Amino acid sequence: MVFLPLKWSLATMSFLLSSLLALLTVSTPSWCQSTEASPKRSDGTPFPWNKIRLPEYVIPVHYDLLIHANLTTLTFWGTTKVEITASQPTSTIILHSHHLQISRATLRKGAGERLSEEPLQVLEHPRQEQIALLAPEPLLVGLPYTVVIHYAGNLSETFHGFYKSTYRTKEGELRILASTQFEPTAARMAFPCFDEPAFKASFSIKIRREPRHLAISNMPLVKSVTVAEGLIEDHFDVTVKMSTYLVAFIISDFESVSKITKSGVKVSVYAVPDKINQADYALDAAVTLLEFYEDYFSIPYPLPKQDLAAIPDFQSGAMENWGLTTYRESALLFDAEKSSASSKLGITMTVAHELAHQWFGNLVTMEWWNDLWLNEGFAKFMEFVSVSVTHPELKVGDYFFGKCFDAMEVDALNSSHPVSTPVENPAQIREMFDDVSYDKGACILNMLREYLSADAFKSGIVQYLQKHSYKNTKNEDLWDSMASICPTDGVKGMDGFCSRSQHSSSSSHWHQEGVDVKTMMNTWTLQKGFPLITITVRGRNVHMKQEHYMKGSDGAPDTGYLWHVPLTFITSKSDMVHRFLLKTKTDVLILPEEVEWIKFNVGMNGYYIVHYEDDGWDSLTGLLKGTHTAVSSNDRASLINNAFQLVSIGKLSIEKALDLSLYLKHETEIMPVFQGLNELIPMYKLMEKRDMNEVETQFKAFLIRLLRDLIDKQTWTDEGSVSERMLRSQLLLLACVHNYQPCVQRAEGYFRKWKESNGNLSLPVDVTLAVFAVGAQSTEGWDFLYSKYQFSLSSTEKSQIEFALCRTQNKEKLQWLLDESFKGDKIKTQEFPQILTLIGRNPVGYPLAWQFLRKNWNKLVQKFELGSSSIAHMVMGTTNQFSTRTRLEEVKGFFSSLKENGSQLRCVQQTIETIEENIGWMDKNFDKIRVWLQSEKLERM
């Protein structure tokens, strides 16, 4: 599943632009072990099970599902037939059911003339989302039984389970469809089932529908028959063995376009009829990517078809249901005339992510949600591996390390968690869908590939997939597969891989020791956080020290953590990558000669940050100001990031970090510029929350002066590579938002002409965001933009307008946006988390956003689910730029009052830590920034 993280942009679905858009706009509930008595029937029969996890002695083998949804009454009924076996005698069958009305349950045994069917007594435990079926006599070990359950339910008004979605045609007609979103624990909302990933089974699915509708599911349609009342019953082929959360079905009036891969797999994209002309790009990308994965994994895609469906109402970014992946429209549909370059990048990466899941996650699935990263970390990592080959023009490899910085931002907090961490209840499970599971997971895999070599790493994961196909795995299963490729005894592994002699190194450490992958990677998956590596150069001796990097403390936290850190470095004397495996707290390596500078973590391929003691930072700052291209753009971006992260823990002064940033005046590459903005913009956002207007204004002016030359070079066109176009879009937006008059005047001219054409003038896509942001500042412009928003068929255009509308300084209009997006009539509720956060970043809007969150909390967690990434996004988006003690006390007071309805959410702990960090940071650095802004070096800019 692609979740939409805190730093998101629905306008682009791009991991790159997300953080900048947000910046420019201006543990868990305690119900996993219930203390209340188990529920009882009216006759006093108690519920026979008191754990969240299901017992393991009843095993599902095959499901036969019949579901009929009425899109007029918004209800559905169904029959679930589950073939089961028992591994021990039992008269109790425990499975999941949530918000379903069970009308009858029976147990079938035997076959032919000896077939018998007995009624089962049904007990419900709503709090645990379980039902118990009590048989009149114990089930016998090894014999086949079939449980038959008749039930009914209402189509969900949320974004999970079997839920209602709507859209309007060009003519304004409202149409209704029904779709599913089961991951992680919502299959139980559509049919009673053993809703845990380890209970894999096959599925036969039948859907009843009206003739005017179309039904699709995981497998191809086998036949359709007419049944009572003129309804059509679609029978779909039997699935492969899979987890319940991967089941999917959609009843709609969608249309589709299709192509066939080289291996004969039919790939189709489904969308509402008015938008099917936007499906071609995703279709071509899906075909290419599916073919790539079949070749890379050396395992054929096991299903005969792969559908991709754009759902009008969708909470996350996308979902990997086997054979029927589902997406937000903005994550799948590409309008050649109006979609941005970053939208193309985002769509490509999202499709790559979901198709990677067809192997990582679907074919091989984590045993339990504590190892979710085995699914999501791999899928995130494979996005970059695949797209770098299938779409080289996108140059996605340059952007990978940005995901590591995103992960580090939350992993630096005490409230972070290990990549693999225990979870039990649904809210805890939902909280696992975060930057640590996705981005840190991907980053440590990339680090491992860099350490082992690409070929050895590939061989290891192919063996992992082949060995565990249609099964479930734990952390150690992956390391065991890697270990078989790379033995720990120092002997060359399979096919000669893992021989360290293939790497040049100034150190014997890398050569002589065996590659103990499991021991090494356990330090990265079983410990939270990441190391700070401190480098001290004494002549030819390089002293290295590792400690746990954690914000909120000027000293290293006393966690006792040690990592096996595969260090890489280059020097002023050699651009060859040198390698050193640091397994102890301190170590020393000896260079062949003295050097002027040394740069560790080459290309940001390692998940750690580096501090250079003594004059180390001065040397690197001088290098950047003199010949910044002496190191790669990724290395330049990582230096910017590391410098400002060190300010947070008191290892480097804010003046030195700001001095380093001055080199950006000569920078032209996207990643260093974006990283510079990611570090500098939050500084004045913190000032906004303290009403420090004078210094805030000076800082914004400094930022524009710093990048003015690059801004002035931007053309108001759609020319150039994807990275050049994304850089243009963000620089022009930055300039216009900060009232840089050459930009504002040009944007005003474009907006005036666009408005005079009634929105028919074709604007350059790359400048549209800046044009709309300027146009929305007037009441007339805002109203015109909203009128166009209502009827636009382009996801990119709608999101660009949405962004602009949230930029207004009119509080009444901001409040209206909050109210209407929450209602969902005029603006879809799926947009609400983004709108709330955009308004939370608006200097005049953030009090409105914070008040709205508090006032509507109970409704929000009902709609978006406690523990979901959407709830985390809203909590962090409305509060994590607060920088005063008054706001901190407000935040603490509100969330503590929620008790089990949110007080222990990880995002709440994160935002409290972040606000405390903001307060401390401002107290220590604000006066220094004020003085620095008046320094002579700035006068010479």
Swiss-Prot record:
Q: Name one GO cellular component term.
A: extracellular exosome
Q: Which PROSITE patterns match?
A: ZINC_PROTEASE (PS00142)
Q: Write down the top EC class of this protein.
A: hydrolase
Where found, per UniProt?
A: Endoplasmic reticulum membrane
Coiled-coil stretches noted in the UniProt entry, renumbered to this chain: none
- Induction or repression: By IFNG/IFN-gamma.
| Residues reported to bind Zn(2+) | 353, 357, 376
Instruction: Summarize where substrate binds, as residue positions.
Output: 183, 317-321
- The record places the active site at 354 (proton acceptor)
Instruction: State the Gene Ontology terms under molecular function.
Output: aminopeptidase activity; endopeptidase activity; interleukin-1, type II receptor binding; interleukin-6 receptor binding; metalloaminopeptidase activity; metalloexopeptidase activity; peptide binding; zinc ion binding
* Quaternary structure and interacting proteins, as annotated: Monomer. May also exist as a heterodimer; with ERAP2. Interacts with RBMX.
UniProt-recorded name of the protein? Endoplasmic reticulum aminopeptidase 1
Specify the taxonomic lineage: Eukaryota, Metazoa, Chordata, Craniata, Vertebrata
